[in-house]
């Protein structure tokens, strides 16, 4: 299995997968950047006009812009989700190639065409070396033990990223809300001014922050429960339960909770933790592999 993951066909799948996820992150970056820019501009213009004796409807216009942007951001999020779905299906194909389990057409749907995979792969501009040896530390004499440990790696790697990003989003969102309220008191804003000039223009980014933080927390808890259920099989020695059918069930959960509903994590956070999390995952896989070889 480990040798097969570096075959030309499977590396092409990983290249295509990476391209799709990177493309979705471009839409994500645009969506978040503009959502942040709108309230910043609203506050800046308010400060600029603060000493003016005339009246200004700028705050009202930014409230309108913020409301319209919510609708535009929703459409951008749909484009973002389309590339996430393509990337998830291509990653599913990669796993199916390695794990010797069937494609779940009912859950996953149709496969991405070979032509689209080739097209996406050719557009990938990243470092191909980082795609090699996708799964590590697997040397059990039981094939499906290697499979389920690879699946657990997918689950546990995601938990670390999701929890850290969830905490970051919640902290920043709460901090932003309190700072803007404090700013309103400091400049003696009325409640109406605060709502029109700060809160309404900020709604898209605040909704994203709190909603995404909550969703990431729920996903990480679900993934942790799945990961722990795999560990329990090793603790009890019930390796006979680890077969193609069981692995397909875990693969379904990975697709639902960790891929198709995936919330994009910033690239810098992903690479910041990659080496540390990879090393930890490989060591755990080696330990569990040795344990499985005793049976």
From Swiss-Prot:
Its main location: membrane. Signal peptide: none annotated. Keywords: Antiviral defense, Cell membrane, Membrane, Transmembrane, Transmembrane helix. It holds the Pfam family S_4TM. The chain crosses the membrane at residues 26-46, 56-76, 167-187, 190-210. It is found in: Cell membrane. It comes from the Bacteria. Effector protein of a CBASS antiviral system. CBASS (cyclic oligonucleotide-based antiphage signaling system) provides immunity against bacteriophage. The CD-NTase protein synthesizes cyclic nucleotides in response to infection; these serve as specific second messenger signals. The signals activate a diverse range of effectors, leading to bacterial cell death and thus abortive phage infection. A type I-B CBASS system. InterPro entries: IK1_05631-like. This is Probable CBASS effector molecule IK1_05631. GO terms for biological process: defense response to virus. Induction: Part of the CBASS operon consisting of cdnD-IK1_05631. It is a multi-pass membrane protein. One of its GO terms (cellular component) is plasma membrane.
């Amino acid at each position: 299995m480990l040798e097969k993951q570096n075959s030309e066909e499977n590396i092409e799948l990983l290249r295509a997968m990476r391209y799709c996820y990177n493309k979705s992150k471009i839409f994500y970056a645009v969506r978040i950047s503009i959502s942040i820019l709108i309230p910043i501009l609203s506050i800046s213009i308010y400060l600029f006009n603060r000493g003016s004796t005339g009246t200004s409807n700028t705050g009202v216009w930014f409230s309108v812009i913020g409301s319209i942007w919510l609708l535009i951001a929703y459409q951008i999020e749909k484009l973002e989700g389309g590339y996430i779905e393509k990337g998830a299906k291509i990653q599913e194909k990669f796993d199916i190639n390695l794990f010797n389990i069937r494609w779940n057409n009912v859950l996953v749907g149709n496969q991405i065409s070979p032509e689209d995979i080739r097209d996406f792969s050719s557009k990938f501009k990243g470092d191909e070396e980082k795609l090699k040896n996708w799964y590590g530390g697997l040397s059990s004499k039981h094939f499906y033990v290697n499979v389920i440990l690879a699946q657990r790696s997918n689950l546990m790697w995601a938990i670390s990223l999701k929890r850290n990003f969830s905490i970051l989003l919640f902290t920043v969102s709460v901090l932003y809300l309190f700072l803007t309220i404090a700013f309103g008191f400091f400049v003696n804003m009325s409640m109406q001014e605060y709502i029109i000039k700060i809160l309404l223009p900020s709604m898209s980014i605040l909704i994203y922050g709190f909603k995404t933080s909550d969703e990431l927390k729920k996903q990480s808890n679900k993934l942790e429960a799945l990961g722990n259920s795999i560990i329990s099989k090793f603790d009890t020695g019930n390796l006979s339960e680890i077969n193609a059918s069981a692995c397909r069930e875990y693969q379904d959960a990975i697709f639902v909770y960790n891929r198709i509903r995936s919330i994009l994590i910033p690239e810098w956070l992903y690479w910041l933790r990659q080496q540390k999390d990879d090393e930890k995952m490989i060591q755990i896989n080696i330990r569990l592999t040795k344990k499985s070889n005793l049976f």
